[in-house]
Amino acid sequence: QKDGGSIYYINLSQDEFKLGGSSFAQTLNKIGNDVPTIKDSNFFKKAFNTVQELIKDSQIVAGHDIGSGGLITTLLEMCFADVNLGAKIDFSVFEEKDIIKYLFAENIGIVFQAKDNATIEAKLNANGVSFYKLGNATTEATLDFGPCKLDIVKYRDIWFKTSFLLDQKQ
């Protein structure tokens, strides 16, 4: 949301960014052997329950799971929700420096926008839930991450067209 707080990412898998089994790997006609998995089921449960509490307390104003297409697709789809909505993202928070891995890995995770950053961070920290603060929503229809600025209108049109064509085949 344009007037919301910061954008956060929680890697529910607690695994490294892996491309095996991803849509990205499929575009290269590969499946891959190294697929992400949930490394710590206790963390998963703790993080899930904490996020549910934050939703119940109206502290999360928008959210999306990481699924097909990875983090880049999630961020784009979150920006598709409104006109003149974009995001400025800083991926330097990740230890992983391979941009392909963190953009396209399909590790189970969530991205959400906070109502109040301090409340969100206090709750996550108190419950031992690790998170990454990625950036903020903007009123410019671009997904801006360092050297790349993606035009939301252009990618929304591609997404709708692709979804329409896929629906016709199903």
Predicted regions and their residues:
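Glycine-/charge-enriched secondary-structure boundary and capping motifs
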Residues: 33-36, 48, 52-170
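C-terminal transmembrane module of polytopic alpha-helical membrane proteins
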Residues: 39-46
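Mobile "lid/hinge" segments at catalytic clefts and subdomain interfaces of large enzymes
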Residues: 1-39, 52-55, 115-116
